[in-house]
């Protein structure tokens, strides 16, 4: 699968529309089975027009796609719920929020084998936007306690259906968990990639990382949000990864725009991953867990 993140496109003003070219180029090179946009996709102007452009690209390619909401995705003309509802009706979009928990676009997508059995899981979650406890607590949003409970229940259900063995899983959302900094600072296992800005995670930690460790299904999480970071590290052997920023007009000295590839391996708790830049260059190839052994 191919992760793009933080496109910040506005087709009405022409802002960052070159991101469409980046997406098409990298899709042509990598030929993924699924594209995931991890937030801050259509952040101002008329998001419906922008998402229709994404729909046209993926429809032409016959490419299934998924969107997680970023903190900026509800700052245009639509609320987060309206964005989530709109996405579910677009061609090839797999978003399927059943309204089971706090936030919007929280769902699990099972990856099935040729015999139609669940072999892996993709968790898609809304990491929300901004603190709901201002002015006492500032900063970014965090997973609500009900979302942590929802994840635990979904993991438990799929584990029970698999003879009480956790299925290999990965999770996509926008804002990094607080534990990302610990993965970067891990002195025993060096992260792969670049960290050019401080992790902008939430001030409040509601325990999603701990829940995933306890459930033993999630191998790694993949986020965006911090445009200048593209590393993958481990914390307690769970991979914590950034995608590569896909927008063309970004702040500071961000890396060349691109996307992150994740290749799951049927029947194994392992995945390959790398960054593909718009110029065609492949950087930071690695395998979890083999590349992260102490």
Residue ranges and their predicted role:
Residues 6, 23, 35, 40, ...:
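Divalent metal-coordination and catalytic microenvironments
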Residues 1-11, 119-128, 172, 239-245:
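Active-site-proximal beta-strand elements of phosphoester/diester hydrolases
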Residues 10-12, 43-48, 67-78, 130-133, ...:
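Active-site environment of divalent metal-dependent phosphoester hydrolases
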Residues 19, 28-29, 58-61, 100-102, ...:
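Extracellular/periplasmic catalytic domains that process cell-envelope and extracellular macromolecules
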Residues 108-116, 208-215, 229-294:
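Binuclear metal-dependent phosphoesterase catalytic core
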Residues 52-163, 260-265:
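Extended active-site neighborhood of metal-dependent phosphoesterases/phosphodiesterases
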Residues 31-33, 121-124, 136-230:
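His/acidic metal-ligating clusters that form di-metal
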Residues 1-53:
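N-terminal active-site segment of His-dependent metallophosphoesterases
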């Amino acid at each position: 699968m191919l992760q793009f993140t933080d496109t910040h496109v506005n087709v009405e003003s022409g802002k960052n529309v070159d991101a469409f070219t980046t997406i098409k180029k990298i899709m042509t090179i990598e030929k993924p089975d699924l594209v995931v946009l991890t937030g801050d996709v259509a952040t101002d102007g008329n998001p419906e027009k922008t998402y229709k452009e994404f729909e046209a690209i993926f429809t032409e390619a016959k490419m299934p796609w998924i969107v997680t909401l970023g903190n900026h995705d509800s700052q245009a003309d639509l609320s987060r719920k309206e964005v989530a509802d709109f996405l579910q009706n677009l061609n090839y979009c797999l978003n399927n929020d059943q309204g089971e928990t706090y936030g919007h676009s929280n769902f699990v997508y099972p990856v099935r084998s040729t015999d139609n059995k669940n072999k892996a899981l993709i968790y898609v979650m809304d990491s929300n936007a901004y603190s709901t406890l201002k002015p006492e607590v500032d900063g970014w949003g965090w997973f609500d306690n009900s979302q942590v409970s929802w994840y635990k229940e979904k993991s438990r259900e799929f584990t029970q259906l698999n003879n009480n063995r956790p299925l290999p899983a990965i999770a996509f959302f926008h804002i990094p968990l607080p534990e990302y900094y610990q993965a970067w600072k891990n002195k025993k296992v060096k992260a792969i990639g670049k960290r050019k800005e401080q992790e902008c995670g939430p001030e409040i930690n509601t325990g999603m990382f701990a829940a995933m460790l306890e459930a033993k299904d999630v191998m790694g999480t993949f986020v965006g949000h911090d445009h200048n970071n593209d590393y993958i590290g481990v914390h307690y052997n769970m991979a914590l990864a950034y995608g590569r920023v896909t927008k063309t007009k970004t702040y500071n000295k961000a890396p060349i725009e691109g996307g992150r590839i994740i290749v799951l391996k049927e029947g194994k708790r392992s995945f390959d991953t790398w960054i593909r830049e718009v110029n065609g260059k492949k950087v930071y190839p690695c395998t979890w867990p083999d590349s992260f052994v102490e």
